């Protein structure tokens, strides 16, 4: 969740995002960066710079390397540079410079992937990174890009040059033709892979439908309806076994859908009527909860299979529990920016 150019809450938070397995989340601040354990909530690292904001923090599971990009009113690093921070040495150890602003960075143990506004560059994750690939995209100001973290799957997915399409390439075999998925008619707003890299979920700027595709052939597996009104989708995430997804938007609601068993999702009693528009056959979330503040948030599943965590731009942390009937209750609330590493 990128909160640049300005966070209306005035708390210094510029960025919040989960690591690959959602076990941690990192925050970029106007004066440094922080790392938290997701569930249970605990501050793990806090680095404050005398002067300098961090607009993007990308973790690599729980290892000591993080990718940082400068941001905010006084960026710590130039926004056209990717800095790899070694948390054991407490300093940057790799620096990659570009001619334009960096929109996002993705990491896996052997690759650094840098997203610019109309291209994606792939480098070796070595002390002197070597550029391996360049992929063109459509205009991509949000820096949409997902990299499968699985050691047996090297898929990279990003917006294709054709608006609304997703391109999936296998970094282990770039000779293989990419998979092109005509996911939406409108501009893409959000894309995410499951941990295994077998499924991709997408949403467009309209934000009413979430589509799930098979990554090997690009076949549509499910179409899920978030709502009937346009919404800005902030985040989509699968759970560990890709049986569920959670979705957050600017309506202040987090929706939970069944990704594998469509019968769990709600459907209109008029769904079987063939003369009615497709809308009536839509599959709706089986559970949802309102983030009390209505603040922008990112969401992910917690350590328990029936828990969803929301990390909000106003510094609030929520843990909600849902049951098979779809009933939801708030389990934990905290202000994570006000924590210290002693407090849980």
Swiss-Prot record:
GO molecular function: phosphatidylinositol-3,5-bisphosphate binding; phosphatidylinositol-3-phosphate binding; protein-macromolecule adaptor activity
Motif (L/FRRG motif): 224-227
GO CC annotations, alphabetized: cytosol; lysosome; phagophore assembly site; phagophore assembly site membrane
WD repeat segments: 183-223, 228-267
A GO BP annotation: autophagy of mitochondrion
One Pfam match: PROPPIN
Stored InterPro entries: PROPPIN, WD40/YVTN_repeat-like_dom_sf, WD40_repeat_dom_sf, WD40_rpt
Coiled coil: none
UniProt KW keywords: Autophagy, Lipid-binding, Lysosome, Repeat, WD repeat
Disulfide bonds: none
Database matches in SUPFAM superfamilies: WD40 repeat-like
Signal peptide: none
Subcellular localization: Preautophagosomal structure; Lysosome
Functional note: Component of the autophagy machinery that controls the major intracellular degradation process by which cytoplasmic materials are packaged into autophagosomes and delivered to lysosomes for degradation. Binds phosphatidylinositol 3-phosphate (PtdIns3P), and other phosphoinositides including PtdIns(3,5)P2, forming on membranes of the endoplasmic reticulum upon activation of the upstream ULK1 and PI3 kinases and is recruited at phagophore assembly sites where it regulates the elongation of nascent phagophores downstream of WIPI2.
Entry's family note: Belongs to the WD repeat PROPPIN family.
Domain writeup: The L/FRRG motif is required for recruitment to PtdIns3P.
Protein's UniProt name: WD repeat domain phosphoinositide-interacting protein 3
Organism: Danio rerio (Zebrafish)
Taxon lineage: Eukaryota, Metazoa, Chordata, Craniata, Vertebrata
Gene: wdr45b
């Amino acid at each position: 969740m990128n909160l640049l150019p300005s966070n209306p809450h005035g708390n210094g938070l510029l960025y919040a995002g989960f690591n690959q397995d959602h076990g941690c989340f990192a925050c970029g601040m106007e004066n440094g960066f922080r790392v938290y354990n997701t569930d249970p909530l605990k501050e793990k690292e806090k680095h404050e710079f005398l002067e300098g904001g961090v607009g993007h923090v990308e973790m690599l599971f729980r290892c000591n390397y993080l990718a940082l990009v400068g941001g905010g009113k006084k960026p710590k690093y130039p926004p056209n540079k990717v800095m790899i921070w070694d948390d054991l040495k407490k300093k940057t150890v790799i620096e990659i410079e570009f001619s334009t602003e960096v929109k996002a960075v993705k990491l896996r143990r052997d690759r650094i992937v840098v997203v610019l506004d109309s291209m994606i560059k792939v480098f070796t994750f070595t002390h002197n990174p070597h550029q391996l690939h360049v992929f063109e995209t459509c205009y991509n100001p949000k820096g949409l890009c997902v990299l499968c973290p699985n050691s047996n799957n090297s898929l990279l997915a990003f917006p294709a040059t054709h608006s609304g399409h997703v391109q999936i390439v296998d970094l282990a075999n770039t000779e293989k033709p990419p998979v092109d998925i005509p996911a939406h008619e409108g501009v893409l707003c959000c894309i995410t892979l499951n941990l295994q890299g077998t499924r991709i979920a997408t949403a467009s700027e309209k934000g009413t439908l979430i589509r799930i595709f098979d990554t090997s052939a690009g076949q549509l597996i499910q179409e899920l309806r978030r709502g009937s009104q346009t919404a800005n989708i902030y985040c989509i995430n699968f759970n560990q076994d890709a049986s569920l997804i959670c979705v957050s938007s600017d309506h202040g609601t987090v929706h939970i859908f069944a990704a594998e068993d469509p019968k769990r999702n709600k459907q209109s009693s008029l769904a079987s009527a063939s003369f009615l528009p497709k809308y009536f056959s839509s599959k709706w979330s089986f559970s949802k909860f309102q983030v009390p503040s209505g603040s922008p948030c990112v969401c992910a599943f917690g350590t328990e299979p029936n828990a969803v965590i929301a990390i909000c731009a106003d510094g609030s942390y929520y843990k909600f529990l849902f049951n098979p009937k779809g009933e939801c209750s708030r389990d934990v609330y905290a202000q994570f920016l006000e924590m210290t590493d002693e407090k849980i």
